[in-house]
Amino acid sequence: MRPVASFRPPPTFSALQGGASSQATKTAGIDQRGTNQAFSLLDPQSTQSNSTDSSFGEMGNLLMNQVKGVNSMQNQADSMVHSMLTGGDVNEAEVLTSVQKADLAFRMLMQIRNKLMDAYREIQQVQI
């Protein structure tokens, strides 16, 4: 009889934020700061609402702040790529990391949007 491989549960949200990094990420050289920055976009306490518009609501302001954060990350990545392509003094690893951070943040934002749209459609189908 073959021995059963030990079960390793998936990492928790705090572990993904950098609380407990795995050996694989250490050996792969993944920048934990970029992951933390991308996951901080999902943390409602990390964003502050500058607007007090009650018609849009706190959730709407939170989402707008997240969109603005992702947009700024993408703009930063674009400017770094442009600087690298035009011969600027930019480290290639920093450019790649910046592009990957922006990509991860955008993908997470799209997943949030998809979940919100699914919830909205489900609410629409509720019989009154």
Swiss-Prot record:
First-listed, main subcellular location of the protein, grouped into a coarse class: other
Protein name: Flagellar hook-basal body complex protein FliE
Location of this chain's protein in the cell: Bacterial flagellum basal body
Segments for region (Disordered): 1-60
GO (cellular component) term, any one: bacterial-type flagellum basal body
Keywords assigned by UniProt, alphabetized: Bacterial flagellum
Organism: Rhodopirellula baltica (strain DSM 10527 / NCIMB 13988 / SH1)
Record-stated family: Belongs to the FliE family.
Recorded GO MF terms: cytoskeletal motor activity; structural molecule activity
Pfam families, alphabetized: FliE
GO biological process: bacterial-type flagellum assembly; bacterial-type flagellum-dependent cell motility
InterPro entries named among the record's database cross-references: FliE (IPR001624)
Comp. bias intervals (Polar residues): 33-55
